[in-house]
Amino acid sequence: MRIPCLFKREAVSSSTAAWLAACLLLALLGGCGQQAEAPVTTQSSPANGWPRSIMTAKGEVVIERPPQRIVSTSVTLTGTLLTINAPIVASGATQGGTAITDEQGFFTQWSDVAKTRKLQPLYRGEPNAEAIIAANPDLIIVAGTGGDSALKLYEQLNLVAPTLVVNYDDKSWQELATLFGRATGHEADAAAAIQRFDSLAAATRASLVLPPQPTTALVYYEDDSGANVWTGASAQGKLLMDLGFTLAAVPDSVKGDKSMGIRKDIIQLSGEKFADGLQGQTLLLFSGNAQTAAQVKRNRFLAGSPAIKAGHVYPMGLDTFRLDYYSATQLLKHMQTLFRGNQAAASEQGKAETNPASRG
């Protein structure tokens, strides 16, 4: 196995090269042996901004030159690397062939991009150090949080290549793109993707007629036992607030023990106080579809929720569990359809109220 070297090489100056050539000629003629050696100079100034220092959850990481073979151990972070056209060659994956993944275990929102770029799946689920190392990476990306974290392999992987440990529970995909752009030299690609998305987000916000506020954004458990509520630190929460939504507060009295101090992006609700945590006048169901919305409405323990009583329960799509450029773009388009429809409905309702023929 070849371990890539990212250390700087010494550069020979033009004057030294000329001297060596002259010395070689004299040696052939038998007269260079007693000449004094000229000093060899090294290039000390960074070339085009390299090397670069990136501060991570594990401290400072120095990347000597632009990486050419990036390996992502986090399927959540892979989408953002694809977004900025980073040279990612392989990625960890998750269970394949589900409602949100393709047969390789990659998320459906960027599956086609992964296939076009011939991205290789390394493993599914449990991180595999041998598979990661065999991909011959010159930069390794590790999630510091979440179910796809390979943090336990950090010490081993960091011996192979510079390893960036990145927490995604408190960052939007834009923040991740900016970080990865600097680490890979793809700042321009990151900035362009963010600009495209921001333009779409601004147009979306201008077109929306918001449902009643505040809003509870959540991922509903399939067994009806609880939910994860997105906080303002989550990518989902940040996007909603950018669009003008107000996030409903979750009372401390109903937060689960695991919600305290471990993850910043979610609050876990379950048990008899589950319903008390759903304070929003509107429920947005992330990683949910129409069937999920119907299931939530059937849960008799949630019947007293103001959003359910008023019928303000909206599925956001199955691919919104992890927001990257691709899924967030699809979410914006979905919301344009969903809540622009409210505008049309309001218009029709206004016509009905002013049309005597429509009254019973």
Regions found by a protein language model. Give the residues of each.
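A short, structured surface patch at a secondary-structure boundary
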Residues: 78-131, 144
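Bacterial signal peptide processing site
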Residues: 32-36
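Bacterial N-terminal signal peptides that target proteins for export
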Residues: 3-20
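Charged, glycine-enriched surface loops/patches
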Residues: 150-188, 294-315
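Structured C-terminal subdomain patch of bacterial secreted/periplasmic proteins
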Residues: 182, 276-360
